[in-house]
Amino acid sequence: MRERGLLIVFSGPSGVGKGTVRAKIFESENNFEYSVSMTTRKQRPGEVDGKDYYFRTRDEFEEMIRNGQMLEYAEYVGNYYGTPLTYVNQTLDEGKDVFLEIEVQGALQVKEKVPDGVFVFLTPPDLEELRGRLVGRGTDSAEVIASRLEKAKEEIRLMSEYDYAVVNDKVELAAERVKKIIEAEHYRVDRVIERYVHMIDDVKV
């Protein structure tokens, strides 16, 4: 019996380094699939449907919402973005671990539907470090940075909704911590007990 994969939900405040840590995790040999999001925004030159995004019309996306086919979704700058439930379930059934990198509010939506997922919160060492990273991007005004820091405070308060908290003090260390969490989750008794119960039942004494 093939073991079903794990749904790994990875989130944290803006600027904490989610994408950088996730990329470092994917550098080593693994059984991970990065979840492909669905969007209603226009397809850009060079983008491949089903690889970069699943591109759908607004009507198609809203119909999927009504039919309960989205694991999570949000509207941003007039376009929908979300995670299709069928893709996630098919990939998990193939025995692969699905890595879902999303914002905190999206993660809470997922937890309602998939409570046995592995929820990992990436946090900065402190808010001053986070401020430095946001300033270092050089893309946001002082007002935007202040707004992001206030939102970060709200998100950090929701850390208790997660299974694990990982400090991103160094990218390499943070990536190793997340990999160890995932490895340990595969050996939890509630995930493997059926396999071993069948083994005992099959033995004739």
UniProtKB/Swiss-Prot annotation:
Disulfide bonds: none annotated. It catalyses: GMP + ATP = GDP + ADP. The keyword Kinase applies. Signal peptide: none annotated. GO terms for cellular component: cytosol. Residues 5-183 form the Guanylate kinase-like domain. Its EC number is 2.7.4.8. Belongs to the guanylate kinase family. Essential for recycling GMP and indirectly, cGMP. This is Guanylate kinase. It comes from Lactococcus lactis subsp. lactis (strain IL1403).
